[in-house]
Amino acid sequence: MEELSILELASKGGWIMIVLAILSIIAVYIFVERFLAIRSAGKDDKLFMDRIRDYLKNNDVKSAINFCRNTNTAAARMIERGISRMGKPASEIQTAIENTGNLEIATMEKRLPVLATIAGGAPMIGFLGTVIGMVEAFWQMSNAGGNIDISLLSGGIYQAMITTVGGLAVGIIALFAYNYLVAKIDGVVNEIEAKSLTFMDIVSEGE
């Protein structure tokens, strides 16, 4: 029995498989780029807030700001904005922190809608390829009249099904990648929320 490699199967899927290949490359790029960006934004220093507390207790605002800039995480950028508002009403400091936090979250979520679209759209594109292939197979069957070659018909059908397999594969991988990144972002969000509460406690202690 003849065996086909994955590459040979993909080549039989026609132009739909080219579209799916492009989508898979885009999905991999987005996943790797976002993974690295989120990991950088979410680096956790357990002693970060202790250092900030010490600097502010000693009224060393400049060192606190420099420490935030050198740490360069989402939480650090948020705390830096809060420090720059110190001396103003607590509500204004809180608003500044929340606005910066929202910007950081939006930055981490950049391109995720594209990944979600690929996760949902790739299976549909694959199914479209299958429908097109089935239409072509039955068109050939109708033109053959009474001289139907079952082997040719079955060959056309299995080639049509290849695009559904390809679409599902790309969609499933993209879906897992999307959910993984969302979970990573949720972890960073929880971290920056905890640090923002700690910072507001520090501000209250200094009043």
Give the ranges of each region predicted by the language model.
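Hydrophobic alpha-helical transmembrane segments of polytopic membrane proteins
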Residues: 158-176
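Alpha-helical membrane-interface segments at transmembrane helix boundaries
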Residues: 4-13, 98-119, 150-162
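Alpha-helical transmembrane segments of integral membrane proteins
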Residues: 17-30, 116-123, 170-174
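Predominantly long cytosolic amphipathic alpha-helical stalk/bundle segments
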Residues: 42-128, 132-144, 176-207
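Hydrophobic membrane-targeting segments
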Residues: 1-47
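Helix-loop-helix
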Residues: 133-161
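Residue-level signature of catalytic and energy-coupling elements of molecular machines
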Residues: 14, 28, 64, 79, ...
